[in-house]
Regions:
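Short, conserved beta-strand element in jelly-roll/cupin
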Residues: 58-73
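Short acidic-glycine-tyrosine-enriched beta hairpin
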Residues: 77-93
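Conserved short histidine dyad/triad with adjacent acidic residue
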Residues: 40-58, 92-93
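A short, N-terminal "cap"/entry segment at the start of jelly-roll beta-barrel domains
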Residues: 1-40
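Ligand-binding loop in jelly-roll beta-barrel domains
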Residues: 93-113
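Short hydrophobic/aromatic-rich beta-strand segments that constitute the beta-sheet cores
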Residues: 53, 73, 108-110
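Active-site helix/loop of acyl-thioester processing domains in fatty-acid/polyketide metabolism
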Residues: 48-50, 71-74
Length: 113
């Protein structure tokens, strides 16, 4: 089916986001891989205490829009990005970075393609 896709976010509509066996915030999916196209879009949030910095490899091209809070993303072989509310960034598949959430609550819109 070709869209449109729609979702409504309630307080209970979030699932834990796991990286390397550690919970790093929560995610709410708008659209996931349908088997034909590797595509995903949704929201990611971190509430409460600041998590420890974590390594992340971009498995797909990924674009983010920071909606709340701030993050420092240290891209291997690239710049250190300091992103806050309203900032948008895009990363190529295969890129690696260390993420450090610097202000909570943190929330971003993400699109993987």
């Amino acid at each position: 089916m070709l869209g449109p896709w729609h979702t409504h976010v309630d307080a209970d509509d979030w699932e834990p986001m796991e990286l390397a066996g550690e919970t790093v915030g929560e995610v709410h999916s708008l659209r996931s891989d349908d088997g034909e196209q590797p595509y995903e879009a949704g929201l990611w949030r971190v509430l409460g205490d600041l998590p420890a910095p974590f390594a992340y490899e971009f498995g797909q091209n990924e674009t983010i829009h920071v909606l709340e809070g701030s993050v420092v993303i240290d891209v291997d072989g690239g710049p250190v990005l300091e992103l806050g509310e309203g900032d948008i960034a895009s990363f190529a598949a295969g890129s690696r970075a260390v993420w450090r959430i610097s202000r909570t609550p943190f929330k971003e819109l993400f699109v993987l393609s």
